[in-house]
Amino acid sequence: MGGALLCLVCSLATAAVQPIRIGVPGAFTGGSAPMGLSMRNGIRLAAAEINRSGGLLGRPIELVERDDGGLPARGIKVAQQLLTQERVVAVVGFVNTGVALAASKNYQDARVPVMLAVATAAILTRQFPLHGNSDNFIFRVAAADDLQAPLIVREAVQRSAYRKLAIFADNTNYGYQGLMELERALGQHGLKPSYVARFNLQERDMANALLQARNAGSQAILTYAIGPELAELANTMARMDWKVPIIGSWTLSMSNFIDNAGPNGEGARMVQSYIPDEDDSGRRRDFLDGYQWLFHTRRIPSPPSAAQGYDGMKLLAEAIRQAGSLDGVAIVHALENLRQPVAGVITTYKQPFSRTDHEALELNVPVIGKVERGRVVYAYPADKLRQ
């Protein structure tokens, strides 16, 4: 009897400290790896801070990380793994739009909350319409494409007074969604693209498309692609001695654009949710110092990805605390009705979500960055002061 009782006590004690398993799917290899690895590190840093403070509901967080390589088919397999084998209670992650589009239904059907930390297609948080008592389990803490595109166009049309703008977008879902949003944003200014180019991943010949864009009188290039192909674009422009600005989505801040383009990437401008700065203080200084200490590096390959991953984990954690439960529906309802502000890197989140709006970032949050001497800095002093 005593042995049985001891076993029961041990079993209950073990159950009481079982970790809360959070899935972290993302591209940790391939061309999107700078985003994926930075995102993962941001999530790890947030989880480490939460665990140092006692965890959630008296239990530690355990991250279950899986590499989808930026491939939609692998993303579906990762989702199935995380749901059926790893039994995660929620997910923070997703780098590539195509992967998120392919895999998000698995989580929605399983009623497991997802915090998108990088993938930006506008449709992602709106693809599961609300009917009656149904819930949408997809949230985001990143600048969606329908938020970025108007800022890109505003930078080109209002700030720079360009009227002839070419669009270069890759042939992924990311590029397609971005192209649509850029065309829509140009249309709001009464403009159409001077030229549109689509190209494949690992494209190594952009000269013909750039020649046509130049012949169309394009004054600047608007981009929706990722680092390696963006570098090829900048390098080809340099070989052609065609000096027009590159203005694009946040991926122009990726390390594999800046490194591979070298001096040819100087001056490229992009939308950013977060720019590390030597004058940072408070929460931003703590985040940067913590990242550099924990991961033994002075450089973040994709700073917005790291900050968004960090903030996404913090928002999810606060929802779990408020819900007092690991039930997916309870976590969703808590996210939609957060009572306490959440101090993040990008901003302090005060009721960032509602039942009908699952986007944490609004139009007034992102800023414009530019590549200067191999790193991204604020393009405008006013943005630095505002952030």
List PLM regions with ranges:
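Bacterial N-terminal signal peptides
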Residues: G2-S11
